[in-house]
From Swiss-Prot:
Annotated localization: Secreted
Tissue expression from the record: Expressed by the venom duct.
PTM remark: Contains 3 disulfide bonds.
Keywords, comma-separated and alphabetical: Disulfide bond, Hydroxylation, Secreted, Toxin
Superkingdom of the source species: Eukaryota
Family under the similarity heading: Belongs to the conotoxin M superfamily.
Entry's Gene Ontology cellular component terms: extracellular region
Descriptive protein name: Conotoxin reg3c
Lineage: Eukaryota, Metazoa, Spiralia, Lophotrochozoa, Mollusca
Amino acid sequence: CCAFPQWCGAGCIVPCC
């Protein structure tokens, strides 16, 4: 999961959006 939602899909293994 990303620590910050705005990072989802931008380098996260498991997007959390």
